Swiss-Prot record:
CDD domains membership: Radical_SAM
NCBIfam families cross-referenced by the UniProt entry: lipA, PRK05481.1, PRK12928.1
Family matches, as SMART domains: Elp3
Record note on cofactor: Binds 2 [4Fe-4S] clusters per subunit. One cluster is coordinated with 3 cysteines and an exchangeable S-adenosyl-L-methionine.
Keyword Metal-binding annotated: yes
Top-level EC class: transferase
Designated name of the protein: Lipoyl synthase
Residues bound to [4Fe-4S] cluster 2: 94, 98, 101
Keywords: 4Fe-4S, Cytoplasm, Iron, Iron-sulfur, Metal-binding, S-adenosyl-L-methionine, Transferase
Co-factor requirement: [4Fe-4S] cluster
Pfam families per the UniProt record, alphabetical: Radical_SAM (PF04055)
EC number: 2.8.1.8
Organism of derivation: Shewanella oneidensis (strain ATCC 700550 / JCM 31522 / CIP 106686 / LMG 19005 / NCIMB 14063 / MR-1)
Record pathway: Protein modification; protein lipoylation via endogenous pathway; protein N(6)-(lipoyl)lysine from octanoyl-[acyl-carrier-protein]: step 2/2
Length: 321
């Protein structure tokens, strides 16, 4: 029996290579079997690309990454033109192989010790008032990357004392207590962790993750920091029903989560999980009404909503769709 080839540090695996060894086999989609995108998913391109080019240049110059690019977000042009970006720390290689996600899998390099300072300087130069910091999963690190998050928050606040910082964290599998101890030294202004989908779809969509772990992470952070809003995001179109998503919303509220994002899953390539349905704007409106009824303080629900989509406006309590 041949052993799997050892991953080389820093080498990105994408598409078929990425999903070759996950519990549920991914059959590459054929064009004729893929659902046609409805009109409501058309993205308007900005009249000018200059702001987009400026942000990309700033990221490249400092060796930084944005999840907007690495995960092929459909809102990249809008957000970059709006002057916002979600920074992805700890490299651009993830230790997990989630087949809905376009971020590369592989064996990551050692964290860049200068990244927190470079990130803080870039944010200052971009004159941002609200930033979202996320990361790949780093199961190779003892603390799951929590110390690097804390270092980034500290350095950002040194150079940008008026800024608001939202962090979108991985699940810190097997090390929740250690991670939360570290983050308690530099708590963010908003704590975000995505459940992504309903629990019965975790095996195919989030191999290596656990629904209850994720709920516990959100609840335990809230218990330590009752004044910091907690937030989570979900995708639709992976085979779930509206009733299943409604139950997830109830679970989130039972675990004291206050902010919600709910959007449409879009298949990054034929090697990723297929879109099983396109959810209509009317259905998103119904789920938004349920979220409001359940007591979420902020709920952004719509086809193009993503976890950090207009996060600054949502944190201000403004309507986001």
């Amino acid at each position: 029996m041949n052993r799997p080839e050892r991953l080389q540090p820093g080498v990105k695996l994408r598409d078929a290579e990425k999903v070759s060894r996950i519990p549920v086999k991914i059959v590459p989609s054929e064009r004729e079997t893929m659902l046609r995108k409805p009109d409501w998913l058309r993205v308007k391109l900005p009249a000018s690309n200059q702001r987009i080019l400026d942000i990309k240049q700033a990221l490249r110059a400092n060796g930084l990454h944005s999840v907007c690019e690495e995960a092929s977000c459909p809102n990249l042009a809008e957000c970059f033109n709006h002057g916002t970006a979600t920074f992805m720390i700890l490299g651009a290689i993830c230790t997990r192989r989630c087949p809905f996600c376009d971020v590369a899998h592989g064996r990551p390099l050692k964290p860049d010790e200068q990244e927190p300072v470079k990130l803080a300087q870039t944010i200052r130069d971009m004159k941002l008032k609200y930033v979202v910091i996320t990361s790949v999963d780093r199961d190779d690190l003892r603390d799951g990357g929590a110390q690097h998050f804390a270092d980034c928050i500290r350095e950002i606040r040194k150079l940008n004392p008026e800024i608001k910082i939202e962090i979108l964290v991985p699940d810190f599998r097997g090390r929740i207590d250690a991670a939360l101890d570290i983050l308690s030294t530099e708590p963010p202004d908003v704590f975000n962790h995505n459940l992504e989908t309903a629990p019965m779809h975790y095996r195919k969509a989030r191999p290596g993750a656990n629904y209850q772990w994720s709920l516990d992470l959100l609840k335990r952070f809230k218990e330590r920091h009752p004044n910091v809003p907690t937030k989570s995001g979900l995708m639709m179109g992976l085979g779930e029903t509206n009733d299943e998503i409604a139950q997830v919303l109830r679970d989130l509220r039972e675990h004291k989560v206050e902010m919600l994002t709910l959007g449409q899953y879009l298949q990054p390539s034929k090697f990723h999980l297929p879109v099983e349905r396109y959810v209509s704007p009317a259905e998103f409106d119904e789920l938004k009404a349920l979220a409001d009824e359940l007591g979420f303080t902020h709920a952004a629900c719509g086809p193009l909503v993503r976890s950090s989509y207009h996060a600054d406006l949502q944190a201000q309590g403004k309507e986001v769709k």
